[in-house]
């Protein structure tokens, strides 16, 4: 009997193959009512059942090969078939974009349809009917959101998009070679197909120095999964999450800071905000990605192209540059006035408590934006204008560039310029807020006596970080449609950092045991020319490495914290774990939380070594406490910094990015000035060195 996880994973696997074809490497069969077949296949339904159904020779072969009967999912007929016309206008093999308002609306309605089903079994039946009639990425997105938000499916892991649509992440040449390998070579003899490290440009393009970041599979999966956990449209109980708008700000602010830090290390300058949409876009990008659903490429952008108004009737999409130019002054006026106006005329303060959260939902135009008509859709429509810069009117029947998808947008250098522009709007609001007071920053109960790091190995170097290349493998069989059964491994090379530990010595003067919060940030020192950065620049580029609760006894406490326990990251297995492991119930492979990929915890640095300031503070738990129960060592609670906690409030009442999210008081000219008055803070100088060597990741 199929488990709930197997039923739903079968619906998600091989998204372009009809559901009547066997799934799970030929071991899972769906027994469908005949009227569930699409118009193409219903006239030959009996023939298909004889060839591919639960009683077919294919099913018998499974028993002969494994000695175990195949798993059969019997789909029950529905008394009333759901009306899917709200979504069927998006063609099954066309592109799908959460930045397109009409696509987003269809996704919200489909999510609601799935959420409204009375139980998980009925959801399986309804999803089985809808699957082959709808756009494949749309179906995957809506069903995944529903699985994450239904009480009766929360034990079902959502497979990584890499395993469902690998074409959005890997060199298309690798897919051709995978199909060749699968057609000719027996499973036990197949070799991983290597994906080149640099296949989108040569070193003649300076921006290619950052391809390791922009085109990292884990980084792009993080962006996709964040938008899965925090959908902008759908039923209110799905969209309305604690501090959703602030998380939109903070997650993007942190990835921009990480990107900028590595730009400096690679000899590249500041990210220039894309503030003028009428100027030519100097950056080019040739993504080298192919949508296998229709064999159309993600279109490139040539150097110096000019953004135009978008009017594409087939996509039900109409966006004018003037729209953004009219919305933006209203947003800035609200910031400068200190309040925004809701659609019912109420003034909503943009204060230190909720201001950034309100502003985040306004800029993303989520379903809980307080006034979508007045403040518009600045963020999403910027993505749309850039995604269709090559064919704004659909004259040449070209689909969008990578800026049109949440799983691909971060590959493009222009993503960072656009988001730097958006980030500056948030910073305008943050600049209005008063600096933190001494009472807010201090902790009279503790003294942070010492801070250092050490590489986690015998005799490991102190205050020294090491990064290097790592070659890993991932099995993409669940996303390769109409291909031979068996494994489909690719190998890819990505950044990795050597494991390390933090060592803190904390003296507690309290008379009893107490709990506090340790916050750890990394701050750059120099720009690309080796010149010192101002404190303001360093504050804005402080990247969060960890935050954790600590139990302190009276007197001296020696705290050791593993880098792998970071509250920012998720482990490799949760980013890349395969569908087969999840079907088997492997808890380590459950894709239950979003988070920054662990292999990107540290910046890359360079071979000469880059110096940073490591900052730690011990803040008062009573000021942080959000009265929420969570276990930092549990699989879904361990990476909350960018993603919060599932179904619970954010675990800290402090502003995200505290204490660097606000300007400092007058007189602070350096990080040392900032730390000096506070015995609960400490700095350490650390050096990050990149080793240009490739180490294979151990495989099981």
From Swiss-Prot:
Glycans are attached at residues 64, 198, 295, 445, 507, 565. Keywords: Copper, Disulfide bond, Glycoprotein, Metal-binding, Monooxygenase, Oxidoreductase, Secreted, Zymogen. Residues 1-51 form a propeptide. Cu cation 2 binds at residues 379, 383, 419. Upon activation, a trypsin type protease cleaves prophenol oxidase to yield the active enzyme. Its EC number is 1.10.3.-, 1.14.18.-. Binds 2 copper ions per subunit. Its cofactor is Cu(2+). The active site is at 364 (proton acceptor). It comes from the Eukaryota. Its main location: secreted. GO terms for molecular function: catechol oxidase activity; metal ion binding. Cu cation 1 binds at residues 223, 227, 252. InterPro entries: Di-copper_centre_dom_sf (IPR008922), Hemocyanin/hexamerin (IPR013788), Hemocyanin/hexamerin_mid_dom (IPR000896), Hemocyanin_C (IPR005203), Hemocyanin_C_sf (IPR037020), Hemocyanin_N (IPR005204), Hemocyanin_N_sf (IPR036697), Ig_E-set (IPR014756). It catalyses: 2 tyramine + O2 = 2 dopamine; 2 dopamine + O2 = 2 dopamine quinone + 2 H2O. One of its GO terms (cellular component) is extracellular region. Changing residue 364 to Q: Severe loss of oxidase and hydroxylase activities. This is a copper-containing oxidase that functions in the formation of pigments such as melanins and other polyphenolic compounds. Catalyzes the oxidation of o-diphenols such as dopamine. Also oxidizes monophenols such as tyramine. Belongs to the tyrosinase family. This is Phenoloxidase 8. The lineage of its organism: Eukaryota, Metazoa, Ecdysozoa, Arthropoda, Hexapoda. The gene is PPO8.
């Amino acid at each position: 009997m199929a488990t709930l996880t197997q039923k739903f994973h079968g619906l998600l696997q091989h998204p372009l193959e009809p559901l009547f074809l066997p799934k799970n490497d030929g071991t899972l069969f769906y027994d469908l009512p005949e009227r569930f077949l699409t118009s193409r296949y219903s006239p030959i339904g009996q023939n298909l059942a004889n060839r591919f159904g639960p009683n077919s020779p294919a099913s018998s072969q499974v028993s002969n090969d494994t000695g175990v009967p195949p798993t059969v999912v019997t789909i029950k007929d529905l008394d009333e078939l759901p009306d899917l016309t709200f979504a069927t206008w998006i063609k099954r093999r066309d592109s799908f974009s959460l930045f397109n308002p009409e696509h987003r609306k269809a996704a919200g309605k489909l999510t609601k349809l799935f959420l409204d089903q009375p139980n998980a079994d009925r959801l399986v039946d309804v999803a089985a009917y809808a699957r082959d009639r709808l756009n494949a990425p749309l179906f995957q997105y809506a069903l995944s959101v529903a699985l994450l938000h239904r009480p009766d499916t929360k034990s079902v892991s959502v497979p990584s998009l890499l395993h469902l649509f690998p074409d959005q992440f890997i060199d298309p040449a690798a897919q051709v070679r995978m199909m060749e390998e699968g057609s000719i070579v027996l499973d036990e003899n197949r070799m991983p197909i290597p994906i080149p490290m640099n296949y989108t440009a040569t070193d003649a393009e300076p921006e290619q120095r950052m391809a390791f970041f922009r085109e990292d599979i884990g980084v792009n999966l993080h962006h996709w999964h964040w938008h899965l956990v925090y959908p902008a449209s759908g039923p209110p109980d799905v969209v309305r999450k604690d501090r959703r708008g602030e998380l939109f700000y903070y997650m993007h602010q942190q990835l921009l800071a990480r990107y900028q830090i590595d730009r400096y290390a690679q000899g590249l300058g500041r990210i220039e905000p894309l503030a003028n949409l009428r100027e030519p876009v100097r950056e080019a990008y040739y993504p080298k990605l192919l949508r296998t659903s229709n064999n159309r490429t993600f279109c490139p952008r040539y150097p110096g192209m000019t953004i135009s108004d978008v009017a594409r009737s087939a996509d039900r999409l109409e966006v004018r540059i003037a729209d953004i130019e009219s919305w933006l002054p209203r947003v800035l006026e609200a910031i400068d006035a200190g309040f925004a106006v809701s659609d019912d005329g109420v003034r909503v303060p943009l204060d230190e408590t909720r201001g950034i959260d309100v502003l985040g939902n306004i800029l993303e135009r989520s379903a809980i934006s307080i006034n979508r008509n007045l403040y518009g859709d600045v963020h999403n429509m910027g993505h749309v204008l850039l995604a269709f810069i090559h064919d704004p009117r659909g004259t040449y029947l070209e689909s969008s560039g990578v800026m049109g998808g949440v799983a691909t947008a971060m590959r493009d250098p222009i993503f960072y310029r656009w988001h730097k522009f958006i980030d500056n709007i948030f910073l305008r609001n943050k600049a209005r807020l008063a600096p933190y007071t001494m009472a807010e920053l201090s902790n009279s109960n503790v003294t942070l006596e010492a801070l250092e790091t050490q590489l986690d190995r015998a005799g490991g170097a102190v205050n020294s970080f090491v990064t290097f290349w790592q070659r890993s493998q991932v099995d993409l069989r669940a996303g390769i449609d109409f291909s031979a059964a068996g494994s489909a491994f690719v190998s890819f090379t990505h950044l990795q950092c050597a494991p390390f530990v933090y060592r803190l010595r904390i003296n507690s003067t309290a008379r009893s045991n107490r709990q506090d919060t340790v916050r750890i940030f990394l701050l750059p020192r120099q720009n690309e020319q080796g010149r010192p950065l101002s404190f303001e620049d360093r504050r804005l580029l402080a990247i969060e490495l960890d935050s954790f609760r600590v139990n302190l006894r009276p007197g001296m406490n020696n705290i050791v914290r593993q880098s792998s326990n970071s509250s920012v990251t998720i482990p490799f297995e949760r980013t890349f774990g395969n569908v087969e492991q999840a079907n088997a119930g492997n808890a380590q492979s459950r894709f239950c939380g979003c988070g920054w990929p662990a292999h990107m915890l540290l910046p890359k640095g360079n071979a000469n070594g880059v110096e940073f300031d490591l900052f730690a503070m011990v803040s008062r738990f009573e000021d942080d406490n959000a009265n929420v129960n969570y276990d930092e060592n549990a699989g879904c609670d361990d990476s909350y910094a960018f993603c919060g906690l599932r179904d619970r409030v954010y675990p800290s009442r402090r502003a995200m990015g505290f204490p660097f999210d606000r300007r400092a008081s007058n007189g602070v000219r350096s990080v040392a000035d900032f730390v000096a008055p506070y015995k609960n803070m400490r700095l350490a100088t650390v050096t990050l060195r990149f080793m240009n060597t490739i180490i294979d990741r151990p495989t099981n």
